[in-house]
Amino acid sequence: MPTISLGTIPMEHGLAVAGILFCLGLVGLMVRRNILFVLMSLEVMMNASALAFIVAGARWAQPDGQVMFILVISLAAAEASIGLAILLQLYRRFHTLDIDAASEMRG
């Protein structure tokens, strides 16, 4: 039985997937009015950039891509926690998750 070597994917394919994910997240960010879907679109965009860092770091065998990945994941976690806190406050005050309702907020 022959051995199958899986190797790594070409850099162009990895960057293409990252670009497609980023574009999908950008479309979701511009089209949706629900703040939960906007946060999810931001997460997809951040993960796409993290994937691009990993692919580029693997191509040149440098650990910089992995370091940037850890930074992006840390920023994504902070963004998710702050975004969900804003989402909860928006829902408690206006009983809706519509972004346009946030323009009525006064502080």
From Swiss-Prot:
The chain crosses the membrane at residues 11-31, 35-55, 67-87. Its EC number is 7.1.1.-. It catalyses: a quinone + NADH + 5 H(+)(in) = a quinol + NAD(+) + 4 H(+)(out). It is a multi-pass membrane protein. InterPro entries: NADH_UbQ_OxRdtase_chain4L/K, NUOK/Mnh_C1-like. Gene3D superfamilies: 1.10.287.3510. One of its GO terms (molecular function) is quinone binding. It is found in: Cell inner membrane. It comes from the Bacteria. NDH-1 shuttles electrons from NADH, via FMN and iron-sulfur (Fe-S) centers, to quinones in the respiratory chain. The immediate electron acceptor for the enzyme in this species is believed to be ubiquinone. Couples the redox reaction to proton translocation (for every two electrons transferred, four hydrogen ions are translocated across the cytoplasmic membrane), and thus conserves the redox energy in a proton gradient. Belongs to the complex I subunit 4L family. This is NADH-quinone oxidoreductase subunit K. It comes from Pseudomonas fluorescens (strain ATCC BAA-477 / NRRL B-23932 / Pf-5).
